[in-house]
Amino acid sequence: MEDETVALVIDNGSGMCKAGFAGDDAPRAVFPSIVGRPRHQGVMVGMGQKDSYVGDEAQSKRGILTLRYPIEHGIVTNWDDMEKIWHHTFYNELRVAPEEHPVLLTEAPINPKSNREKMTQIFFETFNAPAFYVSIQAVLSLYASGRVTGIVLDSGDGVTHVVPIYSGFSLPHAIMRLDMAGRDLTDYLMKILSERGYSFTNSAEREIVRDIKEKLCYVALDFEQELQTASQSSSLEKSYELPDGRVITIGNERFRAPEALFHPSMLGLEAAGIHETTFNSIMKCDVDVRKDLYGNIVMSGGTTMYPGIAERMHKEISALAPTSIKVKITAPLERKYSVWIGGSILASLGTFQQMWISKQEYDEAGPTIVHRKCY
């Protein structure tokens, strides 16, 4: 069924790796970006113990493993572990031979040059890819929404970026990075639930809290008003059944956790909220493009999935923007995977086929070719 040379699209996030085939409308494989190694050598003797586990298998065996995330705040920090994740992607998840398919990889907006070179080198030298390309995550999200100009708020598990894009090119001087994302909100929810008397501490319990966050949290349009409503009635309370059968009740925590996106000071961070960061990024752009950016604010990534976030963002940005400006927030339903979807669209365009870095070009020019061909 697969075309012999169909391109592979891999979106490496801090929390999840999304991988699949160009032209598909969703990734085939979505698994945690983690590598686990046994804490004690020889504990599992005779159980066919491996020296490392990746993704879901590492997650399920986490009791006996030390888990590491090779991508921190969107940037690869551990190349040995990263290589294991890519190996797992090809051989276990997609079941393809990397030397038979062009590979489109995604990268964080302010990825160091040396990192792009290292990625390029690994794909050509370790995996023998026939062709390779690396694309900025936020730009792909914008493509997926059918635009080439706009400003993308991309918030995942490990990092949040605001990236203004004009005619398909990001404007690097105005890109903003906020080291606050899904993982921090999960931690904060653990903290405020413990104040209610529910104790969640270890990594297994953290997964439960992440699930509570994804199922029950939302963004309030008016935080103070919502707090008042929550204190006066039980209308906002929801119950959640824990794996052991106990049922817990969660009230104002439902909207207190995501509120930190707008007020990072709640987490003890000295940073502007996502609304101010977006506004600041727009203000760093040329005055002539601002109107187009205000009218095309696109949300992307799992941490933008909270109900109510687009409405709140609209309210906050409108309060900051000049009165005559029309503010439009787009929050596509598939925004959890819009980076991957944008990659799938790009890699299957006929016009894109001359953009790939070929193995021959790499052999002639070396890893620095990535800066000339991918920008």
Curated annotation (Swiss-Prot):
Keywords for the protein's UniProt record, in alphabetical order: ATP-binding, Cytoplasm, Cytoskeleton, Hydrolase, Nucleotide-binding
Catalytic activity annotation: ATP + H2O = ADP + phosphate + H(+)
Keyword GTP-binding: no
Enzyme class: hydrolase
Its EC number(s): 3.6.4.-
Principal subcellular localisation of the protein: cytoplasm
Cell compartment(s), UniProt: Cytoplasm, Cytoskeleton
Recorded GO CC terms: actin cytoskeleton; cytoplasm
InterPro entries: Actin, Actin/actin-like_CS, Actin_CS, ATPase_NBD
Nucleotide-binding among keywords: yes
GO molecular function terms noted in the UniProt entry: ATP binding; hydrolase activity
Function: Actins are highly conserved proteins that are involved in various types of cell motility and are ubiquitously expressed in all eukaryotic cells.
UniProt similarity note: Belongs to the actin family.
Name of this protein: Actin
UniProt organism field: Yarrowia lipolytica (strain CLIB 122 / E 150) (Yeast)
